[in-house]
């Protein structure tokens, strides 16, 4: 999915970031349908400000809260150099639960670090080292003996069972991936239909880490010799996912449920709308799940207060206000309520009798009006009793344990094994190169420059389905073939249209993947729709999913979420689409460079502010000193307040683009292959950390 980046504009041959303090960070091109903590892997992947979900590769940043993720889709880390791995311990570094003083920017939670072993980079270094271990060294580290009796066919069964177990954790997990549960021997009636819990205790973290260690030991018992190339790839992928997950249990689970990025209620209408109704039984299961929503809502105040009291991470007043705006919409007692209108639209699309349709609509409306709305109204009143709400959220690294969490978050977003400082320096160098190129082009071709500044250009297609057809025709010859698949553009019901969503790709259910759907918000401004259709459709996420499937991927691979890989690819083709729009090549390059620089600058500021503790002086030095932009110290204070609540928001889009671009170009040069061949080799691997991509790119997966 796509996210809208920090606004950038070309002025007098020098790029200038436009009024950052007025930039709405959540005003994205599109947004993932599900950014909730329960399932960061949404089934729908919108073009948005966020992170992706199972909505194709992406939604909000596709990261999960430690303690809530499926074991097959762990989290990710990032930081300092990679020394020899330290012995794995059972105890998480999370401090004991305490009740801190009120959290404010001046007193951000239970004691800012660093302390010995906390917020000093050593935790990230430890996990980077574990991620890079060979299978043999990993066995020594975890005290595991190879079981030579296990064969390749046993590993196949292991991977199949792993997938089934991971999606059988709850009804909400299962419907993200499976159309026919019976074909996987999943008893739907026995599933957990609840929406999960709203907070994670220290005990939960310890239990979660112990469980992950047991999964690591189980994996490492399988011999690597004798496996097929695809099996070896999945072996490495899953080991990485598990180490990342263990790291996630070793950091404090900072979460802000009133933050638009983490808000558990903001996308609930779209999430429920994407539940597939193939038969009447699906509607009945939907009702069973819907009826548990009030219990989750009732627990929310406790979860928010627990987060504040034990981790010192509190929402601010503006978030509370925005959250209450969402509650107003959800409490709408008319038929235009998103939980009623969206459901009615789904029922109208079913092949059932008029009597059954009427019955289902009435039952849904009754649940919403008599159970969910009263629970939401009671919750709204409970919000008044929450203590510790701040005037402004402080940068993540200013909280005790915050830097360790941020290191983990960045690796979870990027899967590249680079420290915060390394990523920041890397992006700074990219910005310098892009700005120099931009200035050079603008000086040589002022007509192209003014055409861009004045918006004096038009894309060759403006309707979503027309754009996808155009891109298939024009970009198709230079990219891997999509194959003989069915796809369609479908529009959200009017009542579900949201400002934050432009479009998203709905990842097909794995046992019924014939139809690929790109969901579009017809009420959104169509600016950027051309690139968004490339990002979500062809040659973006839709091609990504189908090439991985064609390469013989295992079901469980679809539960792995490496946003640096998936969003990096989607951003690459999003920008490449401009080259096929019929523009003067200099105008096309100016459009691309401005977009790249805008994303990169915001990512750099995020890394500096939330990761390294930049204050107004450091922000000023970067924007006014390094880049030569006109910003005051007061402006820079405003930038910090804008970015502090959204750690890691754009990093997978910004840095992911550059790493994917470098990976493909490097492979072309080293192997003397075409761009199309390099893209196919990249996409056949599927979601993976970049060191795994480098290891397996070009492998023959038929062997």
Functional labels for PLM-detected ranges:
Residues 1-10:
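Bacterial Sec-dependent N-terminal signal peptides
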Residues 10-12, 548:
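Enrichment for repetitive, rod-forming helical segments
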Residues 25-117:
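Intrinsically disordered, low-complexity repeat and linker tracts
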Residues 111-703:
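N-terminal maturation segment of proteins
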């Amino acid at each position: 999915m796509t996210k809208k980046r920090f606004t950038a504009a070309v002025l007098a041959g020098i790029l200038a970031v436009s009024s950052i303090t007025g930039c709405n960070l959540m005003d994205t091109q599109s947004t993932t349908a599900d950014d909730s903590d329960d399932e960061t892997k949404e089934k729908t992947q919108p073009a948005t400000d966020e992170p992706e979900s199972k909505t194709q590769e992406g939604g909000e940043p596709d990261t999960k809260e430690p303690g809530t993720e499926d074991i097959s889709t762990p989290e990710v880390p990032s930081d300092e150099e990679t020394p020899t791995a330290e012995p794995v311990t059972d105890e998480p570094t999370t401090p004991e639960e305490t009740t801190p003083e009120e959290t404010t920017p001046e007193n951000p939670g239970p004691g800012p670090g660093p302390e010995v072993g906390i917020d000093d980079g050593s935790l990230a270094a430890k996990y980077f080292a574990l991620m890079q271990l060979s299978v043999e060294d990993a066995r020594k580290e975890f005290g595991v003996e190879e079981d030579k009796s296990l064969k390749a066919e046993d590993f196949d069964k292991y991977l199949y069972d792993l997938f089934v177990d991971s999606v059988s954790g709850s009804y909400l997990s299962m419907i993200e991936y499976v159309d026919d549960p019976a074909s996987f021997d999943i008893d739907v009636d026995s599933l957990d239909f609840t929406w999960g819990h709203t907070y994670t205790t220290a005990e939960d973290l310890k239990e979660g880490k112990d469980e992950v260690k047991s999964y690591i030991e189980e994996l490492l018992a399988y011999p690597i010799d004798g496996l097929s190339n695809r099996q070896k790839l999945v072996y490495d992928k899953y080991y990485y996912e598990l180490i990342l997950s263990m790291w996630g249990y070793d950091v404090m689970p900072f979460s802000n449920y009133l933050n638009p990025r983490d808000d558990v209620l903001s996308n609930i209408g779209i999430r429920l709308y994407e539940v597939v109704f193939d038969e009447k039984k699906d509607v009945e299961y939907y009702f069973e799940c819907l009826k548990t929503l009030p219990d989750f809502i009732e627990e929310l105040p406790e979860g928010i207060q627990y987060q504040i009291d034990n981790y010192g991470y509190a929402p601010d007043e503006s978030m509370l206000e925005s959250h209450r705006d969402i509650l107003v919409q959800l409490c709408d007692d008319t038929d235009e309520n998103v939980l009623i209108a969206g459901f009615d639209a789904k029922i109208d699309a079913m092949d059932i009798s008029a009597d059954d349709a009427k019955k289902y609509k009435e039952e849904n409306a009754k649940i919403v009006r008599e159970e969910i709305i009263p629970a939401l109204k009671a919750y709204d009143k409970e919000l008044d009793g929450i203590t510790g709400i701040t005037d402004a959220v402080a940068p993540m690294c200013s909280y005790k344990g915050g830097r360790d969490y941020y290191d983990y978050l960045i690796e979870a977003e990027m899967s590249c094994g680079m420290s915060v400082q390394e990523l920041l320096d890397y992006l700074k160098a990219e910005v310098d190169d892009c700005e120099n190129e931009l200035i050079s082009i603008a000086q040589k071709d002022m007509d192209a420059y003014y055409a861009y500044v004045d918006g004096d250009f038009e894309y060759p297609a403006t309707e979503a389905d027309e754009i996808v057809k155009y891109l298939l025709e024009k970009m198709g010859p230079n990219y891997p073939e999509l194959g003989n698949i069915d796809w369609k553009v479908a529009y959200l019901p009017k009542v579900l249209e949201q400002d934050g969503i432009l479009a998203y790709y709905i990842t097909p259910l794995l046992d019924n993947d014939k139809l690929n759907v790109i969901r579009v918000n017809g009420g959104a401004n169509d600016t950027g729709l051309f690139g968004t259709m490339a990002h979500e459709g062809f040659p973006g996420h839709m091609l990504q999913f189908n090439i991985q499937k064609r390469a013989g991927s295992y079901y469980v691979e679809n539960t792995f979420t490496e946003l640096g890989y998936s969003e990096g690819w989607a951003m690459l083709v999003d920008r490449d689409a401009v080259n096929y729009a019929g523009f003067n090549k200099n105008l096309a390059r100016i459009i691309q460079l401005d977009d790249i620089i805008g994303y990169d600058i915001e990512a750099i500021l995020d890394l500096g502010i939330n990761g390294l503790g930049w204050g107004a002086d450091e922000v000023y030095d970067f924007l006014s000193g390094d880049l030569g932009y006109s910003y005051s110290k007061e402006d820079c204070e405003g930038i910090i307040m804008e970015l502090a609540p959204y750690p890691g928001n754009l990093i997978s889009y910004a840095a992911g683009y550059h790493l994917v671009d470098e990976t493909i170009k490097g492979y072309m040069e080293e192997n003397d292959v075409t761009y199309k061949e390099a893209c196919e080799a990249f996409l056949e691997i599927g979601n993976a950390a970049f060191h795994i991509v480098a290891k397996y790119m070009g492998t023959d997966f038929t062997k």
